[in-house]
Amino acid sequence: MAINITVITTANRARRFVQADGAAIEPIVDSLNRSSQLFAGKPLIIGSAAHTEVFSTASVACVEFETDGDLSDHMASPMNLVLTALSPQELTVPFEGVIEGEHFKVRIDFFFTGGYVLHTRAEGVRKAVLAERLMNLTSFLERPVMNYRLPQGGIGLMNPHAISRFLLTPGVADLPRDAWLAEPA
C-alpha cells in the first residue's frame, strides 16, 4: 500500500508527498488516531533524505491522505454526518440536496482564509431535537479538526480554525433566533 499526502495551505497551494514503504507508512497512519491534535499549534513536519519541510499549522487548510487502503478505522465520525469531498465530475452536475424526515443530504462548500475552497457532500441523520440541530450547525468552527472522505479513496483532515465561512445548499430551515434573514444579491 502506498500513501499520497497532500498539504493544502490557506494560500491555496498544494504540496504533495508520497510514501510507499510500509514501515514508514505505519506511523503516518497511526498519527491519524491523534488527528484532533494536528492543528493544535505544533508545526507539521514532513521529511525525507532529500529535504525536510515544516508547515505552520495555522496556515494549513487541509491535509489529505489518498490511498487504496481502508483508513475508516482511523477516522472519528463527528456529529451525525459523513462528509465526502466532491470529485471534479460531481462539481459539473447540479447538486440535488434533500432535508426531509430523519435524513439529509446537503452540499457544504468550505471557504478558507486565503482562498482555498473545499466542496463536500454531507449525508446523515437529522437530530430530532431542534437545539441539537442548531448545535451541529454552529459547532463546525469550534472543532479541533473535521474529517472527510476523498472520492478517489482515503481521507482528509480539515482545519476549522482556517475556515472563514461555509455555505449549505439547500438552505437550513431551522436557523438560530439571532440569524439574519436575507437573500444573496
Residue ranges and their predicted role:
Residues 15-55, 127-132, 142, 147-155, ...:
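A cross-kingdom feature marking solvent-exposed beta-strand/loop segments within repeated
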Residues 109-185:
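Structured core of small recognition/catalytic domains
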Residues 1-15, 42, 49-52, 57-119, ...:
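Intrinsic disorder/low-complexity detector
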Residues 36, 98-100, 138:
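Generic marker of residues within folded, mature protein domains
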Residues 19-25, 57-63, 122-128, 160-165:
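A short, sequence-level motif marking secondary-structure junctions
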